[in-house]
Amino acid sequence: MILVLAESAIELVPREIWSHPAVASDARRRGKRPGEILLDRARHHPAMAGLEDGARRGRPDIVHQVLLVFQYSLLNRRGLGRVYIHTRGDYIIQVKPQTRIPKNYNNFVSLMEQLYALGRAPPHGDSLMELHRGSLAGLLEQLGGRWVVLHERGARRRFAELGAALLNSVVVVGGFPHGDFSNRWVLEKAEAVYSVGDEPLDAAQAVCRAVAAAEASAGLI
């Protein structure tokens, strides 16, 4: 299973709010420039009022939660999973299977800021995470040009059937807190669209169910 977390709400603080007191004080407290820190709704809410599409931005915690679910799963540890993060600013983050994601959120934020600064982490030796410019369309084409989507309006399948469908597929999940994919073709061109619950789920919950179904199909549970 190759997971693609798409249009993820992770980015550095945009230039237009660098001078806002909420951003400036946070950067000063952390000993960094405003443009070197992640945009975070929990810390920068007052500054985000005028940002375009602000309700869907500043949620790096979504990426953190999804990576914790996926990277520590049996599916990944047995070599049956890979994950890519596509960001709303059209960056691609490739996470190698052996990468141990920090469980502490503040440590995760520092890791991601390092990744944005250097394009890789750690700075020396073999890279475990890499960041480069790239579109969602380009990534999906690179991964074979065929994918399925987890979406609240998708078709329901029995657990075993869902697991069999996901195990060897590229699986796209939205990495944003509200709304729908801005790239409508993600749904329109998907081979299938599946729902994993009777109501909308957070990205981490959807990924958890998808991983469990794929693990069951692989005989891991």
From Swiss-Prot:
Signal peptide: none annotated. The record marks R59, R100, K103, N107 as: Interaction with substrate rRNA. S-adenosyl-L-methionine binds at G174, G179, V196, G197, D198, E199, P200, L201. GO terms for molecular function: rRNA (pseudouridine) methyltransferase activity; rRNA binding. Its EC number is 2.1.1.-. Methyltransferase involved in ribosomal biogenesis. Specifically catalyzes the N1-methylation of the pseudouridine corresponding to position 914 in M.jannaschii 16S rRNA. This is Ribosomal RNA small subunit methyltransferase Nep1. The lineage of its organism: Archaea, Thermoproteota, Thermoprotei, Thermoproteales, Thermoproteaceae.
